[in-house]
Amino acid sequence: MRSVIEPDHSIQLNEAIYCYDICTNDFAYNLIAVAFRKHLSLLLVGLPEESGEFGYTRLQDMDLGEKEQRSVSALAFSPDTSLNCTPNNVTLCAANGSQLKLYRTDLGQFTSLQVLRGHGDYVNDVSWVCDGELLASVSDDFTCRFWTTTGGGENVITFGLSSAGMSVKSHPEDPNKVLVAEKKGIIHLYNVTLKQTVISVESPKFPLMSADWAHSNRLFITSLAGGDVVTWDLNRPYVPADVKQVHEDCGRVVRFAPGSSEMVIAMVIGLTLKVFAAKSTVPLLEASLKSYGGMAWHQRLPYISAVSDRKLLFWKVQMK
């Protein structure tokens, strides 16, 4: 175990970062989307384990529109995003106020924008589900909505919630199920094909601010609610497998590490990044941030990243 204050690598940008996403696809896993006040930027990062040194390239900027007053709250790359084809194929959804903005680009000649409207309030999270056939979104309007993105784009399913929707997640091994987390602490696994809830669990505390679904084991889900990180094993869903009290503050985001054999969880509490092995109360890593603009794991290499004002910071985590 080690505690780290300073990041191993950083990207200095010219404006404050509102949120970002690192692509998880096999053919674009170093692609990063960054949201600023009025535009998005696509970056390609190089990590020392692959390219010998750390660096990045700014590939393209995309305008959010002058009229938009709300900042981007979530970003998600579609599963068919690839930099290993000709032409390149990048599809990115940005949650911008109550709208979903769908950008498609080949990073060269062609860029298009499609706007999906239907939510009545701020969208908190977006995720591609059903192997990329549908886009899912959750909002302060107490709904989870599913959208087709071909043609004009259509809201084909609406799943009513009892409080604001905070997180929506898919799983590569179970593409027809979606994790939907509500602010009052209820987490549903929803079968999109059957249009019904399969199982629900409830956090002992609320408000719930974030939830995630472990890619390394689809039976494990976690939430950050009321200052606790609560993890469930869905084989025994009625009692949490682990409750970790991390702070009186309710926190901001929680994420499982994608490739670790043991459950490793990262979170941002206030302006502190913490990484824990699931059963441990001693952090593997702890670092201070100047502002909050998101947090994400790299899909292939053991790096956790987070925003601090105008910087995107990377820490290497020692994991099993």
Swiss-Prot record:
Return the SMART domains for the record. WD40 (SM00320)
Do you know which SUPFAM superfamilies this protein is assigned to? WD40 repeat-like (SSF50978)
User: What does the entry list under GO cellular component?
Assistant: nuclear pore outer ring
Entry keyword set: mRNA transport, Nuclear pore complex, Nucleus, Protein transport, Repeat, Translocation, Transport, WD repeat
- After gene disruption, what is the outcome? (Microbial infection) After infection with E.chaffeensis, results in reduced bacterial replication rate and increased survival.
**What is one Gene Ontology biological process annotated in the Swiss-Prot or TrEMBL record?**
mRNA transport
In its keyword annotation, does this UniProt entry include Heme? no
Record's keyword annotation contains Metal-binding: no
Compartments in which it is found? Nucleus, Nuclear pore complex
Which parts of the chain are WD repeats? 67-113, 118-157, 160-200, 203-242
Gene3D superfamilies per the record? YVTN repeat-like/Quinoprotein amine dehydrogenase
Q: InterPro entries, per this entry?
A: NUP37 (IPR037626), WD40/YVTN_repeat-like_dom_sf (IPR015943), WD40_repeat_dom_sf (IPR036322), WD40_rpt (IPR001680)
> Could you tell me what this protein does?
As part of the nuclear pore complex (NPC), has a role in its assembly and function. (Microbial infection) Required for optimal replication of E.chaffeensis.
Alphabetical list of PANTHER family matching this protein: NUCLEOPORIN NUP37, NUCLEOPORIN NUP37 P37 -RELATED
The protein's name in its UniProt record = Nucleoporin Nup37
Gene from which the chain derives = Nup37
